[in-house]
């Protein structure tokens, strides 16, 4: 048990914000913080994986990325495109031919990110990867990404409800953030009516209604007018440390060029 003053000294890095990447999110008071659990939810093809990967690459914080949903070829192609501005077609061709230009390869080498590509990692495999990271770097990463949480094997036996295991997984990831001091980001799906991904998604749109535990929940929707870049809108529908709007109607807008995987502030 700790007094309030003792809590000040034992918190470690918990609560420290990770570097902002997009001013639009920063101005909304949406900050990823160490020691906390964040859920990023969107329909298929909206760009949630691109959004989180772009954050990890551009923030340049030490990251352990559990890429269950995408293989090494896909993630490397995306990373090359994000960092170089190349089209995804050019990036995938360069990766396939193992012919990445030196300047791009050097920029990849500068990013302190490590990937785990287990398609259905168990909790033991996640813990082993974290232990290996700690043994290698003598510290835990600032950011841990689980993409996505439905791929994690929880071996839950709580009846026939497929989301009972996700609720316990949220508790597990929450505790992971507390114990490691890492910001843990989980990617997740939304309910059927919101799968089109072209309208604001409220807190109630999260698949399985597992929003009890995370400190922050972001929902993404994407709007295209058929000309120029798309608009990737980020709604902060839950935020224990700041402003939120559970309806999803208040959002930060980012410019998203899908062909080159570029996500930027408008007018950057």
Swiss-Prot record:
Q: Does the record's keyword annotation contain ATP-binding?
A: yes
Please name the GO terms that the record assigns under molecular function.
ATP binding; ATP hydrolysis activity; DNA helicase activity
SUPFAM superfamilies, per database record: P-loop containing nucleoside triphosphate hydrolases
User: Could you tell me which InterPro entries the record lists for this protein?
Assistant: AAA+_ATPase (IPR003593), DNA_helicase_DnaB-like_C (IPR007694), P-loop_NTPase (IPR027417)
- Alphabetical UniProt keywords: ATP-binding, Nucleotide-binding
GO:BP terms for this protein? DNA replication
Is the keyword ATP-binding in the record? yes
Any idea what this protein is called?
Answer: Gene 65 protein
Source organism (scientific name) = Mycobacterium phage L5 (Mycobacteriophage L5)
């Amino acid at each position: 048990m700790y007094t309030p003053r003792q809590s000040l000294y034992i918190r470690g890095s918990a609560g420290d914000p990770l570097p902002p990447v997009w001013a639009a999110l920063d101005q909304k008071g949406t900050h990823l913080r160490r020691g906390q659990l964040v859920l990023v939810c969107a329909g298929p093809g909206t760009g949630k994986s691109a959004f989180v990967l772009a954050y990890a690459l551009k923030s340049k914080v030490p990251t352990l990325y559990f890429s269950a949903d995408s293989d090494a070829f896909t993630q490397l192609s995306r990373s090359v495109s994000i960092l170089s501005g190349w089209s995804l077609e050019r990036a995938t061709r360069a990766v396939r031919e193992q012919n990445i230009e030196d300047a791009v390869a050097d920029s990849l080498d500068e990013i302190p990110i490590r990937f785990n590509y287990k398609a259905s990692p168990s909790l033991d495999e996640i813990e082993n990867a974290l232990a290996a990271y700690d043994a290698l770097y003598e510290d835990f990463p600032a950011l841990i990404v689980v993409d996505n949480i439905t791929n994690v094997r929880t071996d839950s036996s709580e009846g026939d409800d497929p989301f009972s295991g996700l609720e316990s997984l949220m508790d597990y990831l929450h505790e992971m953030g507390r114990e490691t001091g890492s910001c843990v980001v989980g990617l997740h799906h939304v309910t059927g009516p919101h799968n089109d991904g072209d309208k604001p998604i409220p807190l109630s749109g999260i698949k399985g209604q597992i929003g009890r535990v995370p400190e922050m929940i972001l929902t993404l929707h994407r709007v295209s007018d058929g000309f120029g870049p798309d608009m990737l809108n980020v709604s902060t529908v839950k935020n224990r440390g700041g402003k939120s709007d559970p309806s999803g109607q208040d959002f930060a807008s980012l410019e998203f060029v899908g062909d080159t995987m570029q996500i930027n502030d408008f007018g950057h």
